[in-house]
Structure formats: structure tokens, C-alpha cells
Amino acid sequence: PINWIDTSDMDFKEEFIGETFGRINKAEADLLLQELKAYIDRIGGKRVLEERIDFGIISPYKAQVQYLRNKIKASGSLKPYRSLLTVNTVDGFQGQERDVIFISLVRANEDGQIGFLNDLRRMNVAITRARMKLVILGEAETMKRHKFYKELIDTSIPSHRLAERKTHRLILKYLFPS
């Protein structure tokens, strides 16, 4: 199964970083790690370790990959699972598979610019690495401007789940105004 976690209403934005014009979306990466931990908790940490359920975290941007690696290294709650976690770029994951894949798309901008996410061969590599489950985090508002991603999003987010997420965000916004 494919799950798309839409970050459109979360005000996550991509940033340029370093001389290489790398892109990073720290808030999206942080959410990905929260979702990963919640998924492990749902399965059961003991079961994950006993059955050696492995996880891949993929992002098309090296800066995002490095940020995720650093956060995992610093995370006490993910420490028992580090040997089961692989974090890499799309190109770095070519030829590999994992039981569960999380993808951080990074791109979140008002112009709908998605850079080399336009290269569908690379995205094919990313979305075909999961043996059991694929979770994609990305801003649907940015990505839906492109036909492939619109169709992927539409098949990944049933309308009742999308409404449930929007309701949940609304409740959180009301409870924790910024």
C-alpha cells in the first residue's frame, strides 16, 4: 500500500543550503521521523527487531539525506532500530529494496517547481523500493501541478482520509495557535 502524507496545510517550505544549491525541508524531515517512529510503535518495536523489518528513507536531495541521518543519530527513540534504517538519495538506493520505504520529496513552493523530481525514471526507482509499504511525504499543492504526481496523490489519499487529516490539522491549529 501507498500512503501520501500531505504537508500542504503545514506551512513547510524548502530552503536552499550550501554552495551546491542543495535543498532541504527540515520540518518535512522531522515529520517523517515522527511518522517512522509511530509506524514502528504500531507494528511493535519488539516485532520489528525480532523479524528484522527494515526501513529505507529516500530523498532526492543530499542535504535532506544528511539532515535525516544526523537526526536519526541524535534520536534516542530510534537508536534500537538504527541497524534496520538506511537513509540515502534516490540514486544511492538504486538496486536495493527494504520492507518499508519513506520518501521525503522536499519540494514545497508557490511556483510548483519540482526540479529533478520531473525525472520520472528516478521517481520510479524511489517508489519501487518497498516490499511491503510505501509512505511519501510531500506538499500536494506543489506536486499536483504535475500530471504524474497528481495521479499518484489521487490514488494514495482516499478522500475520507484527506478530510480526516485536514480535520486533525484544524484541531491542532485551534489547540496550539502560533
Residue map of PLM features:
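Helicase C-terminal subdomain and adjacent C-terminal extension
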Residues: G112-S178
